[in-house]
Amino acid sequence: MSSKKIVLTSSDGESFKVEEVVARKLQIVGHIIEDDCATNKIPIPNVTGEILAKVIEYCKKHVEDDDDVVETHESSTKGDKTVEEAKKKPDDVAVPESTEGDDEAEDKKEKLNEWDAKFMKDFDIKTIFDIILAANYLNVQGLFDLCSKTIADYIKDMTPEEVRELFNIENDFTPEEEEAIRNENAWTFEQDGKQQVPKP
């Protein structure tokens, strides 16, 4: 890892000293560094210290593990041969290359996915909303996707009314419009071959 440190300062004045390679995971910061606009402190105006700490924790873990996964995969593919090279000796039977490196990369990826799931379980839904806003602003795509999946899993069994309440969405349909929409999309409420049309 790079030894150069970058200080990120949150909207509420909290400062975090991080490795440059970690700071670059926040793409908005990466662009500042690439444009040589980075000073020893980079302000992050739309993110509180509490949320920035969580974003940095995610980025640190993914810098370490993403690098390990890439290195393992690259080392496992160095011995790969082209089809033409394999055909040069027609008397020899082509033996597939070892997939040990690929298996190791898969194991690391699986462990990283487990870490992601555990990381998200620590937060209530409001915190997840704050993190997804920060991930969007800072352009941390992996964290944004992880939060999106977590929210999708959270709301998948909710009724439309519960989702509206969670997201503070006002229902602008009349009862007649709601009924018409439910009837048009009745197939989406089928379970075990039986139609389950929820009541408004």
From Swiss-Prot:
Q: In which tissues is it expressed?
A: Expressed in leaves and flowers.
Q: Which organism is it from?
A: Arabidopsis thaliana (Mouse-ear cress)
Q: Where is this region: Disordered?
A: 67-109
Give the main localization category. Answer: nucleus
Similarity section: Belongs to the SKP1 family.
Q: Which residues form the signal peptide?
A: none
UniProt xrefs under Gene3D superfamilies = Potassium Channel Kv1.1, Chain A
What UniProt keywords are attached to this protein's entry? Nucleus, Ubl conjugation pathway
Q: Which GO terms describe its cellular component?
A: nucleus; SCF ubiquitin ligase complex
- Where does this protein act, in terms of pathway? Protein modification; protein ubiquitination
Cellular localisation: Nucleus
Q: How does it associate, per the subunit comment?
A: Part of a SCF (SKP1-cullin-F-box) protein ligase complex. Interacts with CPR1/CPR30.
Q: What is this protein called?
A: SKP1-like protein 19
Give residue spans, biased composition: Basic and acidic residues.
67-92
Question: Which portions of the sequence form the region Interaction with the F-box domain of F-box proteins?
Answer: 132-190
Which InterPro entries did the record assign?
SKP1 (IPR016897), SKP1-like (IPR001232), SKP1-like_dim_sf (IPR036296), SKP1/BTB/POZ_sf (IPR011333), Skp1_comp_dimer (IPR016072), Skp1_comp_POZ (IPR016073)
User: Could you give a single Gene Ontology term from the biological process aspect?
Assistant: response to auxin
Pfam families named among the record's database cross-references: Skp1, Skp1_POZ
Q: What does this protein do?
A: Involved in ubiquitination and subsequent proteasomal degradation of target proteins. Together with CUL1, RBX1 and a F-box protein, it forms a SCF E3 ubiquitin ligase complex. The functional specificity of this complex depends on the type of F-box protein. In the SCF complex, it serves as an adapter that links the F-box protein to CUL1.
Which superkingdom does the taxonomy of this entry point to? Answer: Eukaryota
